[in-house]
Amino acid sequence: MDPITTLATRLGEHLRRFNAQVTTAESCTGGGIAEAITRVPGSSAWFEAGYVTYSNAQKTRQLGVPEVLFGQVGAVSQEVVEAMVRGAQAASGARFAVAVSGVAGPDGGSPAKPVGTVWLAWGDGSRVFSERRQFDGDREAVRRQTVIAALDGLLQLGTE
């Protein structure tokens, strides 16, 4: 079985045990996390909603990310992904959430945020955790590694 499908299946098993639901807020993965989750039969029991907010305007409109953050720290930042997690939880009512924003490439990188830079955040209803990751490879490799890291982080939330 594909590692992404394996992680998503394990996530579903954990969420069913908690009788909990998850939501996703995605930028650079373009819905890839939600797609991986909904690949799992029965995911409608534990997947509440997915938000693909590729533009900054949609991050603000759909998830309530303060517009001022984009000018202060940029879309690929800890502050933005943490706001995305909180916004997705508020909009969906799901207990667990994951958010990602990154530079998948091949363009768009900078010295401070080179191609492969991704910020991820996870929320469990009371706490939000985030981390910056640097992935290697082409656009698809960065996106795939981001999906894996996002699902793995959700699994770790569910087992703490």
From Swiss-Prot:
Q: Name one Pfam family in it.
A: CinA
Q: What is this protein called?
A: Nicotinamide-nucleotide amidohydrolase PncC
EC code(s) of this entry = 3.5.1.42
Keywords from UniProt, A to Z, are: Hydrolase, Pyridine nucleotide biosynthesis
GO biological process terms held by the UniProt record? pyridine nucleotide biosynthetic process
Q: What's this chain's function?
A: Has NMN aminohydrolase activity, not active on other substrates.
Enzyme class, top EC level, equals hydrolase
